[in-house]
């Protein structure tokens, strides 16, 4: 994973841990304010799980994750159980803990269609479709900096990792992490009904 650390103006034992969405960098959330008295660790690029960061100073962790970041956060805390008790709140945005699933994630047919469209020849059209119009021009320019291969590898990784694994509901790796989930009514990637299905069962 890639990381960006922004310390508070004074030393603190509270951390906002933010898992970004697929393909995105810190520019996607740089306009948001950070609560006073809290450090921020922003993570993105989930082609690997590797993370070099010292969590020992923090007594409280406020977890926030966007889309694929929810899957990445579940995976991270499953490998770092010692941190789970420090999570005081968890906010999930526009996604679920199972990245590819016909009932509670991205429908598999849509997932494969997206992969097929993610080619060097189709890259500009793909980026514009994914990021919308001029309102998100700054995101478009930032995403263009990443190679097509990198985006492809990041997008396919959850499917590759989870393909032959059981997907129980509720998801054990997510227990105790999430206190709120926000679902976009017009989400074109993870259908709102699938998100509702997941969070209704996950609780």
Language model features: what each stretch is:
Residues 1-59, 110-111:
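Active-site catalytic motif of lipid deacylating hydrolases and related acyltransferases
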Residues 30-31, 177, 191-200:
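Short alpha-helix in the alpha/beta-hydrolase fold that links the catalytic acid
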Residues 140-169:
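Hydrophobic, aromatic-rich cap/lid helix
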Residues 17-21, 66, 183-184:
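The conserved beta1-alpha1 loop
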Residues 64-73:
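Gly/Ala-rich beta-loop-alpha elbow adjacent to hydrolase catalytic centers
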Residues 99-142:
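Helix-rich cap/lid subdomain of alpha/beta-hydrolase
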Residues 175, 181-183, 187:
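Short beta-strand/loop motif that positions the catalytic acidic residue
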Residues 82-117, 154-163:
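Flexible "cap/lid" loop of the alpha/beta hydrolase fold
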